Amino acid sequence: MVKIAIVEDCKEEALKLQDILNAYSAREGVKFDISMYDNADKFLFEYDHSADLVFMDIEMPGMNGMEAAEKLREEDESVVIVFVTNMAGFAVRGYQVDAADFIVKPLNAYEFNLKIERILSRVKMREGPSIMVESDGKLYRILADSIRYIEVEGHDVIFHTT
């Protein structure tokens, strides 16, 4: 199951994205658990590191999606972020937060379906047994398969990964 967060202040756009995802799920047999947030502040406050994929609007009242993505990256380096926006000019900044893609509004199911396979391939890189490790106030997800060995020095634990 892929856990998805949709952060979109426009209810119609959020529901349209949810409908497109549900149609894809029914057609391809991929199960989604979708949570919706109408603003970035609420999303960040409630974020528990369980999302695999975040669809983030950029232009929202209060904290915009780009600022929210920067804060999200401070907490979770591996979650897949996709911007859903009519503001293509933010593309360069999106790469600074390692955005997987940009989907331009208004949403189009055909164009979305062309991109979703590539997006889900990034999500699959997060799958598998993993552990969450806190370091310097940040949480990191480490895939068990990527751990070569673990070293203990005093009270420090060092993970050596591939």
Question: Where would I find each of the regions flagged by the language model?
Answer:
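Acidic di-acidic motifs
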Residues: E8-C10, N86
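Non-catalytic signal-transmission and effector/linker regions of two-component phosphorelay proteins
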Residues: M1-A5
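CheY-like receiver
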Residues: F45, A51-M125
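Two-component/phosphorelay signaling modules centered on CheY-like receiver
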Residues: C10-S35, E74
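Conserved binding/recognition cores within well-folded domains
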Residues: L114-T162
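Helix N-cap/capping motif at the beta->alpha junctions
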Residues: M36-K42, G65
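Conserved sequence signature across two-component system core domains
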Residues: V7-E8, Y37, V54
